[in-house]
Regions:
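PRPP-associated nucleotide enzymes
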Residues: 1-228
Length: 228
C-alpha cells in the first residue's frame, strides 16, 4: 500500500487506542516526573500486531517525502513503533551498509548503568546517515532529545522526529521537523501543583508496581487510581 493511502483518520486512531484500553484515567506520575489524571499506555495498543502495523504505516506516511537511512527509538516505549515505522518506509538510496533488500534499519537506544542514554548491542550509524527519531508519547520531549544527542554523537543526522501521541499541546520544540499522529491536550502538573495530590489521591507510576500516596492511602486506593 502506498504510504499516502495508509494514513488513518483521527476517529480510527482513537478507536484503536480506546478498544485496546490504552487510554487510562486515574492519578499518574509520568516518566517526565509530572503528574496527570490521564495516561496513554501505548504498549496496550501496540501489543496487537495488526494495530501496530497500521500505526507504523500511518506515522511513516507523515514523513514520506523524506529520504531516510535509519529509524532510531528510545527504549522501551519506542521499540515497537520504531520497528513498524522502519518497516513501512521505502528503502530508497540508503547510506547504510546493511544487507541488500533488508529495508530501513530500526535501531534503539537505551539507558546504561549510569542512567545515560546510549547506543549499545553493536548498533552503529555511519557519518551523515539521515535519521528519523520515533517515540510513543511526547510530554516534554526529554527522551526524544536524549535519543537525538546519541544519534548526533554517533555521526548521524537527525532530520525529523515522530510520535504516536503529542500530549504537550504543541509545545514540543525539537529543532527539527516534528509530527505526531494524535495531538491530545492532557493537563499535567509538577507534583507540588498537582490537584490530585492535594486531594490525597495515591499516585501510580505506570509500568511498575511502585505506588506512592498519602500515608492513609491503602492498597485498595492505590489499585483504584490505576484507572480504566
Amino acid at each position: 500500500m502506498p504510504l499516502a493511502e495508509a494514513m488513518l483518520k483521527r476517529e480510527e486512531l482513537m478507536g484503536m487506542f480506546e478498544s485496546a484500553g490504552a487510554i487510562r484515567h486515574g492519578h499518574f506520575e509520568l516518566s517526565s516526573g509530572l503528574h496527570s489524571g490521564m495516561y496513554v499506555q501505548c504498549a496496550l495498543v501496540l501489543q496487537y500486531p495488526r494495530f501496530a502495523e497500521k500505526l507504523g504505516q500511518s506515522l511513516a506516511a507523515l514523513f514520506g517525502d523524506l529520504e531516510l537511512d535509519a529509524v532510531v527509538s528510545p527504549a522501551m516505549g519506542g521499540l515497537i513503533i520504531g520497528q513498524q515505522v522502519a518497516r513501512a518506509l521505502p528503502e530508497g538510496k540508503s547510506l547504510g551498509d546493511g544487507p541488500v533488500g533488508a529495508g530501513v534499519p530500526a535501531i534503539f537506544v537505551e539507558r546504561d548503568a549510569t542512567g545515560a542514554m546510549s547506543m549499545r548491542r553493536g548498533f552503529s550509524l555511519r557519518a551523515a546517515q539521515r535519521v528519523l527519531v520515533v517515540e510513543d508519547v511526547w510530554t516534554t520531549g526529554g527522551s526524544t532529545r536524549e535519543a537525538m544527542r546519541v544519534v548526533e554523537d554517533a555521526g548521524g543526522q537527525v532530520v525529523a522526529a515522530g510520535a504516536l501521541i503529542d500530549r504537550s499541546g504543541g509545545a514540543i520544540k525539537l529543532g527539527v521537523t516534528a509530527k505526531a499522529l494524535l495531538d491530545l491536550v492532557i493537563p499535567s502538573y509538577p507534583p507540588k501543583d498537582c490537584p490530585l495530590c492535594a486531594e490525597g489521591s495515591a499516585v501510580v507510576k505506570p509500568g511498575s508496581r511502585f505506588v506512592r500516596g498519602a500515608e492513609s492511602s491503602g492498597s485498595a486506593n492505590a489499585r483504584t487510581s490505576v484507572g480504566r
